[in-house]
Amino acid sequence: MINVKICGVRTRDHALTAVDAGADMIGLVFAPSRRRINPDDAAVIAAAVRTAADDRRRQVSLIGVFVNDDVTRIRKIATLCGLDGIQLSGDEPVAYAADLAPFLVIKAIRFDNSAHERDWLSEDQAHVRLLVDAHVPGSYGGAGVVADWDRAADLARRRPLLLAGGLTPANVAEAIRYVRPWGVDVSSGVESNGVKDHQKIRAFVAAARAAAQ
């Protein structure tokens, strides 16, 4: 079983395509980014996702993506939008893990050897998942650069993680077989000209599912 997250969704149509394709998680970005969405629009998408998932008798988790935001604002948005999980993609301290419980907390790491990252690598609470992304100076994700699969595979042997960084419908199967992650995360890899592509979303989910069988 592989968990598939489609991140950076900004429209209801793309969110519903992800649900229909079989995605397990949909990421809504609240951090400065070209994929940023305002909380009111996100709440509309979240409601549509829940209805579509219920119709299919499936559970689809809504994940809010934040970068160096404060806990109070994160919790406020999470409540407004009915989020299931929080992804921290900045330099947040490990104390956020306890502050944001019982939400699922996904912490992005990039093997940059920073002190806060070492703290998160030592954190082992049941509601925390690590997300391995590529180390791109000045970027907090969505850059389309492939992560370090060797280090990710080593970490995946010790704890469940999501693999991100440069994944596409063409390479996600290889990534799953090599790293054996708990889940995979894609954003730019299912876009055409900077916009989510319905066909690529479907192809990505299908390729991930086939590789995990």
From Swiss-Prot:
State the InterPro entries in the record: Aldolase_TIM, PRAI_dom, RibuloseP-bd_barrel, TrpF_fam
Please give the CDD domains that the UniProt record associates with this protein: PRAI
- EC number(s) stated in the UniProt entry for this protein: 5.3.1.24
Key word Amino-acid biosynthesis present in the record?
Answer: yes
Q: Extract the Gene3D superfamilies matched here.
A: Aldolase class I (3.20.20.70)
BP terms from Gene Ontology? L-tryptophan biosynthetic process
* Pfam name, any one: PRAI
Domain of life according to the entry: Bacteria
Q: Which UniProt keywords apply?
A: Amino-acid biosynthesis, Aromatic amino acid biosynthesis, Isomerase, Tryptophan biosynthesis
GO molecular-function term, one example from the UniProt record: phosphoribosylanthranilate isomerase activity
Q: Name the reaction it catalyses.
A: N-(5-phospho-beta-D-ribosyl)anthranilate = 1-(2-carboxyphenylamino)-1-deoxy-D-ribulose 5-phosphate
Keyword Iron in record: no
Instruction: Give the transmembrane region(s).
Output: none
Q: State the disulfide connectivity.
A: none
Enzyme class, first EC level, given as a word: isomerase
Look up the record and name the pathway of this protein: Amino-acid biosynthesis; L-tryptophan biosynthesis; L-tryptophan from chorismate: step 3/5
User: Which family is this sequence assigned to?
Assistant: Belongs to the TrpF family.
Q: What is this protein called?
A: N-(5'-phosphoribosyl)anthranilate isomerase
Protein's organism: Roseiflexus sp. (strain RS-1)
Taxonomy of the source species? Bacteria, Bacillati, Chloroflexota, Chloroflexia, Chloroflexales
